[in-house]
C-alpha cells in the first residue's frame, strides 16, 4: 500500500473550484471560432465547446484523483530511473537536471511501466468512502525492467511547429504521423492509455500543421543574410530540408548516440502496445487540413512506430531549421550553446550555463559563461551548469565536413578565412 496525499473530500472541493472557473468564462473562450471553426479543426462550433465543458466538469473528480495518484507513481518511476539510466558514475541529474530537457523517452517508458503495474481501480473511490490505494511503489522500484536503458538519454525538447514539413518525428525518427506524435506527447502525462482524448489529439495535429515559428525578434543585417542564404543552400539544405526521412548514424555525424539507442526490443513492444491501447475507438476519424478523412486507429505496425532497436537503424533526423534561432542550445541533447559554437566546433566549451534568458544576438543562443552563475543564481533558480563529460551529454558531432550527393558540404567554419562567410550564414539562419 502506498500513502497518497489526498482525500475524496479534497478532490471534490478542488473539482468544484475548477468548475466554477470554467463556468465564469464566456462562450467561445476555450475554442475561439476564429481558430477552431476552420475545416482543419473539425469544424468546431459553439455547441462543441458546451459539450466539452460539460464532459470536463463531469469527469473532474476522476481526473484529479488520477493526478493525485500519479504524483506518487511518478515519484516511483523517477526513483527507478535514477538507479538505472542515471545511476552510472558519470550520470547527469534526472532529465539533465536542466530546464528544457527531459529523458529520452519523454518519461514514457516508466509511465507505461507504472500503468502496467497499477492494480485495477487504483485511486478510484471505494465502498468505504475512500480511495483504493494498493500500488506497491517499493516492489515496483525493486523489480527488473529491461525496457529501461542502462544509460542516460538526455534530450532537448524539440520544436513542434510546421509539422507538415516533417516526415518523421522524435529525434530518432521513430514516429511518422502527426497524430501518433501527439499520442507520444500525451502518454507520459496521462499515463493510462485508455484516458487519451482522441478528439483533442486530432485537433492538436491539425493545429501544428502550418503553425509558423516565431520570427527572430532582433535586428538582422539583410545584405549579409542574402549572402548567407547561398551558403545555406550549398552546404546545409541538402540535409535540412522538408520531408527528409534519412536517419543519420554515428559514422555520418559523430553525435552522442545514447538518445538514438533509447529503444530496445522490450521498450519498443511497450511503446507499440501503449500506442495501440491509446487508440481505443477503431472508428474514430478526423479530417486533415486538406479535408481528407483520417482513421488513425486502423493503422498498425510501422505506420504507428518504427522499431529502431538495433544500431543498424538507429540515428537522428536532420530537422528543417525553421525558427532555429529559438532552439538553442543545439543538437538533440542541447550540448552546443549557440549557432556559432555549432559551426566552429573547436570553440565548443566543455561546460556552459543553461537556463539564462539573456540572448546573445552575435552567436545566436543564450548567455553561457559559467563564471556568472554565482552572480545570478539567486534570482534565476533555473540556472544549471551543462557538463559535456556527463553520460549522454557529449557535444561531439556535426563537426566535420561531409560529402553528400557527391559534393563536399562544409559543416566546420573554423579559421579566419571563413570569418565573413560564417557571419553571413549565422545572419541568414536568424531569418529561418
From Swiss-Prot:
It comes from the Bacteria. Disulfide bonds: none annotated. Keywords: Electron transport, Heme, Iron, Metal-binding, Plasmid, Transport. InterPro entries: Cyt_c-like_dom (IPR009056), Cyt_c-like_dom_sf (IPR036909), Cytochrome_c_Peroxidase/MauG (IPR051395). GO terms for molecular function: cytochrome-c peroxidase activity; electron transfer activity; heme binding; metal ion binding. Heme c binds at residues 236, 239-240. The keyword Nucleotidyltransferase does not apply. Residues 223-432 form the Cytochrome c domain. This is Uncharacterized protein y4iM.
Amino acid at each position: 500500500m502506498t500513502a497518497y496525499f489526498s482525500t475524496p473530500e479534497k478532490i471534490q472541493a478542488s473539482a468544484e473550484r475548477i468548475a466554477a472557473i470554467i463556468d465564469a468564462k464566456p462562450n467561445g473562450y476555450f475554442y475561439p471560432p476564429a481558430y477552431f471553426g476552420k475545416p482543419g479543426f473539425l469544424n468546431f462550433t459553439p455547441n462543441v465547446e458546451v459539450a466539452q465543458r460539460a464532459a470536463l466538469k463531469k469527469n473532474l473528480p476522476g481526473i484529479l484523483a488520477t493526478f493525485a495518484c500519479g504524483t506518487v507513481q511518478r515519484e516511483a518511476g523517477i526513483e527507478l530511473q535514477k538507479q538505472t539510466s542515471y545511476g552510472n558514475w558519470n550520470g547527469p541529474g534526472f532529465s539533465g537536471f536542466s530546464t528544457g530537457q527531459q529523458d529520452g523517452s519523454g518519461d514514457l517508458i516508466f509511465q507505461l511501466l507504472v500503468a502496467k503495474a497499477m492494480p485495477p481501480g487504483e485511486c478510484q473511490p471505494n465502498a468505504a468512502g475512500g480511495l483504493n490505494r494498493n500500488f506497491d511503489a517499493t516492489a515496483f522500484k525493486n523489480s527488473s525492467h529491461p525496457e529501461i536503458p542502462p544509460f542516460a538519454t538526455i534530450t532537448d525538447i524539440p520544436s513542434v511547429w510546421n509539422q507538415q514539413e516533417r516526415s518523421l518525428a522524435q529525434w530518432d525518427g521513430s514516429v511518422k504521423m502527426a497524430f501518433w506524435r501527439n499520442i507520444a506527447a500525451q502518454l507520459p502525462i496521462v499515463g493510462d492509455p485508455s484516458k487519451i482524448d482522441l478528439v483533442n489529439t486530432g485537433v492538436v495535429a491539425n493545429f501544428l500543421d502550418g503553425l509558423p515559428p516565431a520570427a527572430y525578434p532582433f535586428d538582422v543585417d539583410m545584405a549579409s543574410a542574402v549572402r548567407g542564404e547561398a551558403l545555406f543552400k550549398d552546404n546545409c539544405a541538402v540535409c535540412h530540408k522538408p520531408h527528409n526521412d534519412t536517419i543519420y548514424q554515428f559514422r555520418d555525424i559523430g553525435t552522442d548516440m545514447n538518445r538514438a539507442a533509447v529503444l530496445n526490443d522490450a521498450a519498443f513492444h511497450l511503446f507499440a502496445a501503449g500506442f495501440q491501447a491509446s487508440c481505443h475507438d477503431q472508428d474514430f476519424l478526423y479530417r486533415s487540413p486538406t479535408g481528407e478523412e483520417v482513421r488513425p486507429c486502423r493503422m498498425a505496425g510501422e505506420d504507428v512506430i518504427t522499431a529502431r532497436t538495433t544500431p543498424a537503424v538507429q540515428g537522428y533526423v536532420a530537422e528543417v531549421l525553421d525558427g532555429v534561432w529559438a532552439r538553442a542550445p543545439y543538437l538533440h541533447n542541447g550540448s552546443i550553446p549557440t549557432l556559432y559554437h555549432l559551426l566552429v566546433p573547436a570553440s565548443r566549451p566543455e561546460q556552459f550555463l543553461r537556463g539564462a534568458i539573456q540572448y546573445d544576438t552575435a552567436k545566436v543562443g543564450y548567455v553561457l559563461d559559467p563564471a556568472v552563475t554565482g552572480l545570478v543564481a539567486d534570482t534565476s533558480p533555473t540556472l544549471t551548469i551543462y557538463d559535456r563529460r556527463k553520460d549522454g551529454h557529449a557535444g561531439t558531432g556535426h563537426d566535420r565536413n561531409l560529402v553528400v550527393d557527391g559534393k563536399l558540404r562544409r559543416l566546420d567554419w573554423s579559421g579566419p578565412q571563413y570569418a565573413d562567410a560564417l557571419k553571413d550564414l549565422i545572419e541568414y539562419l536568424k531569418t529561418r
